Amino acid sequence: ALDAETLIRDHPVSTPSSRGGEEMAGVFYTGGTTGFPKGVMQSHWAIWASGMGSLPMFGMDRSSRYLHVAPMFHMADFAGGMAATLSAASNIVMQSFDPTAVYQTIAAEKVTHALLVPAMIKVLLDHPNAATADMSSMEKIIYGASPMPAATLERCMALWPHIGLVQAYGQTELAPVATMLSPEDHRAGGQILKSAGRPTPINDVRVVSDDGADCAVGVSGEVVVKGPHTMMGYWNKPVETQKALKDGWVYTGDAGLFDKNGYLYIVDRLKDMVVTGGENVFTTEVENALISHEAVQDVSVIGIPHDEWGEAVHAIVILHAGSSASEDDLTAHCRASIAGYKIPKSF
């Protein structure tokens, strides 16, 4: 790992440059319908607007202390840090996620807010110190980036009833938040816990049919979002940009529906991607790794529900007639070409 002092010592000082507004602030990589990463161009204005839109729900001020434990190369934690900075809150940065260290840091630094993916929350709940750890300073936990198992959410609410929970739904193309489910909604319980919440103050959300018409309440369609936080487009991908960005609306590739009270429910993903432990796994990459095995004739990779990771990578494999390959063989074959979290957990 690199530290700030090393970077400063070994690199020349950059020439000061004034940038802002609609100029590009950064390129954040994400997956899409093709299964290949795409660079999402976000402007300074979009990132600022997203942070402002999150402030009412995050409820931070200058006394707040925000913990960065989720990977900071993801837009989610980047946006959380923006909201903290706009609130004049303190940013507490951890080098990596370790449950023991997280509990120690929360207690020592009097952390008040944190963004955690559901897999992190489950690891914390399963830790031997979960029941005795000092979480008294914590005010809110924001979660998202992958499906939250109902059992994990119930355990979290039971163990830490004083902590307000906020679910954030969105994607990198939205810098990244589109809707939020409030702490009050969590405490109400029931069916609402399956919802992704309501739109933030800065954006509009619709559910549309294939012809672009608004779907009726309770009828599913594609979720589309419009606001000052939407992307500029995909880096060097004009065709993909045209498909995803229409008249200012970002077509998310997610299927959802609204209830009569304006709460959004995500019912499926249209995009060819599995989200496991908050990380995106492109199924085509896993399929390509498996199909290169000499015994494999055909393969399809899907995501299946998983209590710890939200989703797990599952491979359906057809072997050539007369060939044989065990699950261990296929796992070892994948390990040579793709990251560990992308390897199928089951076959």
Regions found by a protein language model. Give the residues of each.
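Structural core segment of the AMP-binding/adenylate-forming
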Residues: 1-10, 17-18, 321-323
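Conserved pre-ATP/AMP-binding loop-to-beta segment of ANL
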Residues: 11-29, 36, 59-65, 201, ...
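Conserved S/T- and glycine-rich ATP-binding loop of Class I adenylate-forming
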Residues: 24, 30-33, 66, 72, ...
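Conserved AMP-binding A3 loop
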Residues: 25-49
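Conserved AMP-binding/adenylation subdomain of ANL enzymes
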Residues: 48-65, 73-113, 127
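Gly/Ser/Thr-rich phosphate-binding loop
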Residues: 86, 111-116, 125-191, 204
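AMP-binding/adenylate-forming catalytic core of the ANL superfamily
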Residues: 106, 114, 227, 232-233, ...
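Conserved ATP/PPi-binding loop(s) of AMP-dependent carboxylate-activating enzymes
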Residues: 198-202, 210-243, 279-281
